[in-house]
Structures are given as C-alpha cells and as structure tokens.
Amino acid sequence: MAFLGHLVLGKVMAEECPLSAPLVLKDMQSGVAGETGNVWTIAPDCSFTVARQVGLNLLQPHKQGQLTLQQRLQLEQMMDRMAATALPEQLGSGPQVNARRITLAYGGKQSVLTLPPGGGDLGALRAAASDDSTRHMLDLANDLKAMMGGG
C-alpha cells in the first residue's frame, strides 16, 4: 500500500510545474521601429504563449498551449541548471547599433545577451561563443524555443 502511495505521490509531483513565477525568453532585434522579435512565456501552471513584440507592443499570442509531462521534466532540469550556474545580468558585447538581444527573466532576475545585428541561428552562435556563460544562455534559449515552438 505504501508503494502505491509513493507511485501516486511521484506522479503528482512529476505533473506539477517547476516554476514559481513566469519564465520569459525574448529574442529581439533593434532597428528603426525600436525592438522587434518574439517573446516566449511559461506561466507557473506550465501553460505557455509565443507572441510577437513590435516596439513596446506585445501582440496577441500566435501560439499557446500546455507543456507535456516530458517537457515539464525537461523544464525542471533546465531550472536546476539555471540555479547551479548563475548567469550575469549582462553578457556579450557592449551597446551596438541595431543589436540583437536575448533576454531570459525569471523570479525577479534577468540576464541579457547582446549580439551583433542579425546574429543567426542559436546553435551557430553557441559554437562561436567565447565563454561558458554565453554558451549556457544560448543553450537555455535554444531549449526553451524548441520546447514551445519557434517564433
């Protein structure tokens, strides 16, 4: 009987979302119209949205859903990696004209990776990254985008 209770408890714990606050990933490109790009958000109930942002306006989500059990477990592993490797607030090159910025925000903390304009595929950027924090940030961004679907 105790074993059955442990199985049920394990199932309930696995189904819970590992977030206590929204997790937000932004991939933005600066330009004439301000910053434009995509915003991926996972809520504490593990529902998610993907929306375009143009300037200061966040448009209606063009994709939304609920993370699967496997995705929740993957998210829990990502959160453990984030906790183990504190990302600095600023990564990458300094201010640039028309920079690309990847921002990861959770629980009142935010890390911003500044890249040259355009930037390209996150995998290629990761391969060219010169430090572990930048590679870690690009890994997290790539994994989150894959989990919720591209932009």
Give the location of each predicted region.
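Short, internal acidic amphipathic alpha-helical interface segments
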Residues: 67-101
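A mature extracytoplasmic/lumenal domain signature
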Residues: 46, 52-54, 71, 79, ...
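N-terminal secretory signal peptides
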Residues: 13-64
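Short, well-ordered, aromatic-rich surface patches in folded extracellular/luminal domains
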Residues: 12-30, 87-151
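A short, structured loop/turn motif at beta-sheet edges
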Residues: 44-45, 66-75, 104-111
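Bacterial N-terminal signal peptides
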Residues: 1-7
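Extracytoplasmic/periplasmic, Sec-exported soluble proteins
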Residues: 34, 63-70, 129-132, 136
